A protein has these predicted regions:
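Catalytic phosphate/metal-binding cores of nucleic-acid and nucleotide-processing enzymes, i.e., regions
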Residues: 1-103
């Protein structure tokens, strides 16, 4: 299991314990048994969607550390949400995720 997956799991637990509803979003290209490519989601879709106890939507892109690459589509999505006063951000720890989701 890679570092990003471990961080993501810890974040999901912390958000759940804080009263958030958390959904792990899956996106990318997958291949069926017949080899056919299936694309789900869209470019820039964050890793986690949550609803905090106030009923506010929260979009979180999980990165293993602050040096990890941020794709232009990810940056654009997070910025678009913030422009609309929707809670969103890049996070590397449960503490950062709680800051975005609850503060």
């Amino acid at each position: 299991m890679n570092k990003e997956t471990l961080v993501q799991r810890k974040i999901m637990i912390a958000l759940s314990e804080a009263g958030c509803i958390v959904i792990r979003q899956q996106s990318g290209t997958f291949y069926g048994r017949d080899g056919q490519a299936v694309r789900i989601g869209f470019p820039g879709l964050p890793d986690l969607l949550a609803v905090n106890p106030k009923g506010e939507a929260v979009f979180l892109e999980v990165k293993p550390d602050h040096k990890a690459h941020r794709r232009p589509e990810q940056i654009a999505f997070i910025n678009k949400m913030k422009e609309r006063n929707i809670r969103a951000g890049f996070v590397t720890s449960p503490e950062e995720a709680l800051e975005v989701a609850l503060k």
